Amino acid sequence: MDLFEYQARDLFETHGVPVLKGIVASTPEAARKAAEEIGGLTVVKAQVKVGGRGKAGGVRVAPTSAQAFDAADAILGMDIKGHTVNQVMVAQGADIAEEYYFSILLDRANRSYLAMCSVEGGMEIEILAKEKPEALAKVEVDPLTGIDEDKAREIVTAAGFETEVAEKVIPVLIKIWQVYYEEEATLVEVNPLVLTDDGDVIALDGKITLDDNADFRHDNRGALAESAGGLDILELKAKKNDLNYVKLDGSVGIIGNGAGLVMSTLDIVAAAGERHGGQRPANFLDIGGGASAESMAAGLDVILGDSQVRSVFVNVFGGITACDVVAKGIVGALDVLGDQATKPLVVRLDGNNVVEGRRILAEYNHPLVTVVEGMDAAADHAAHLANLAQHGQFATAN
């Protein structure tokens, strides 16, 4: 589960990571009151789970409460990479002397954790890693010992911190590790971690991804998911139906069974999209290896509820999940949705009970559904239909 910035900030504060005051607001008037409460210079920041907020105009400095009102009024309702801004965080301003980068993530390949740190923070980490890879220190963290003072010192030394600053950064890194470990996260990122003019080290912006498999051990997970839109409507609907769903910024909805197949589907749709107007995957949705007709129907309900989706590619290889079960789920979902189903579906079935699955869909003969043999051909057709829809040409799947 990805958290909003304000939720990450609250967890940081709970674990003693130094942060500035921040208040979440869902209306311009609430933002104005928040700015008054904080006092002085504030920054109004869009709360969305994608990068690039600043470039999109989603982060604005507000010297007065009236300007905080205006900033929130401009930001709320904004679309940033397919994500609608429903909330802003009004944050206390800071006099920044230096910006750093720090993150901890799960390193599955090496069965350990990886700490990444740089004295050049503030920019997107992908850009830093590409343009100045030598500026990004990477230090393996033993899961059994974590980040203690010795490990934190190793990290700041590798990153090239000056001695005086390093002594201030070390205790903050240890606190950030406590957030990662105690909250059972798979990613904690602070960008930037700043040194203020007063000499304080503060986590100015944070990103946290929590391990959903650990939800049962944490009483606060339900509140994080639902409080103030902790998940958007589609994510919440997927979570309630035990579907693995991640919203992306494309136009071709993806449903598959098994994470490996879905990941491959994302790649092949992206490649097909290059031939059809730059269409890209709209999501990752895995209904699971033992999916039922109900989970298939729930998955379709989620995808068809995304306004960014122009076509849907259902890619299933029948194993434990038989193709006829998937077909029945598609039929059931379309029956329930009725006239609300307006987006073409391209279905590729293979494996267990594929003949019966194709027969069910052929007899159903829905104008929005096309069954295509072969993953390449199906992905190409789904991208083609999304491209047609983008240019205002209504098209059924057939």
Curated annotation (Swiss-Prot):
Transmembrane segments: none
Binding site residues for Mg(2+): 191, 205
Cofactor note text: Binds 1 Mg(2+) ion per subunit.
UniProt GO cellular component terms: cytosol; succinate-CoA ligase complex
One of the record's GO molecular function terms: succinate-CoA ligase (ADP-forming) activity
Swiss-Prot/TrEMBL GO biological process terms: succinyl-CoA metabolic process; tricarboxylic acid cycle
Family: Belongs to the succinate/malate CoA ligase beta subunit family.
Protein function: Succinyl-CoA synthetase functions in the citric acid cycle (TCA), coupling the hydrolysis of succinyl-CoA to the synthesis of either ATP or GTP and thus represents the only step of substrate-level phosphorylation in the TCA. The beta subunit provides nucleotide specificity of the enzyme and binds the substrate succinate, while the binding sites for coenzyme A and phosphate are found in the alpha subunit.
Protein name: Succinate--CoA ligase [ADP-forming] subunit beta
Higher taxonomy: Bacteria, Bacillati, Actinomycetota, Actinomycetes, Mycobacteriales
